[in-house]
């Protein structure tokens, strides 16, 4: 299994952020796309990049620059020809690959607390869904996944709705499961809005104003995340990770503010 982690030993003691790439790309590409964030946060956080479990064709947004950087991976189905996997198996694979990325970083000598999830596009959807599962377990059972206490999420171009990451949780209405394509192009999306699936773990949302999926990203922000715990950055870009210093600086500032708010420092 391949994961990409920061190789700078000076960061091994720092709080860690687990990073989930988009669909049709991979951890190596996402690390390159996040180079501005890595540079700006290198003295404060260790960013660890997890690889998704499932093989995929390349996403159209990576072909122009990263066409030779395969193989490409995905967390969820995003095309009809992707094999249907039982949802419980899909969730188990996602959890396994995330746990292995975290364990590999432990073996590399890192000791910092896992404080946040950072995801782009499909990785942001999965990150938000994982945070919602953590919140649901805490509320229903007074516990959370073993060893996991993500304090906040950084959601870049994340799309609603959440997906169900635990078939044992009885939710009303039920969320789409991890075997489904949830691109919000179908009328059933209305079932999920305003129905109580609200994430209260703090989140930072980063939206490109020229992103074709902007309306769907705003749905995640407006309809699925609590007003008192959500933050928003809008920048002049399309479906990609901010790279210019002025845009990256805004994201870094808000990450620092979330860290203060959630007691990281």
Curated annotation (Swiss-Prot):
Functional pathway: Secondary metabolite biosynthesis
EC number in record: 3.1.2.-
Catalytic site positions: 121, 211, 239
Any one biological process term the GO annotation gives: secondary metabolite biosynthetic process
Domain of life: Eukaryota
Record's keyword terms, sorted: Hydrolase
Gene Ontology MF terms: hydrolase activity
UniProt GO cellular component terms: cytoplasm; nucleus
A Pfam family this chain is assigned to: FSH1
Known role: Esterase; part of the cla gene cluster that produces clavatol and ortho-quinone methide. The clavatol biosynthesis cluster cla and the terrestric acid cluster tra are both involved in the production of peniphenones and penilactones. The non-reducing PKS claF is responsible for the formation of clavatol from successive condensations of 3 malonyl-CoA units, presumably with a simple acetyl-CoA starter unit, and 2 methylation steps. The esterase claE probably collaborates with claF by catalyzing the hydrolysis of ACP-bound acyl intermediates to free the ACP from stalled intermediates.
PANTHER family per UniProt: ESTERASE DBAE-RELATED, ESTERASE OVCA2
Record family assignment: Belongs to the LovG family.
Protein's name according to its UniProt entry: Esterase claE
Organism annotation: Penicillium crustosum (Blue mold fungus)
Gene name linked to the record: claE
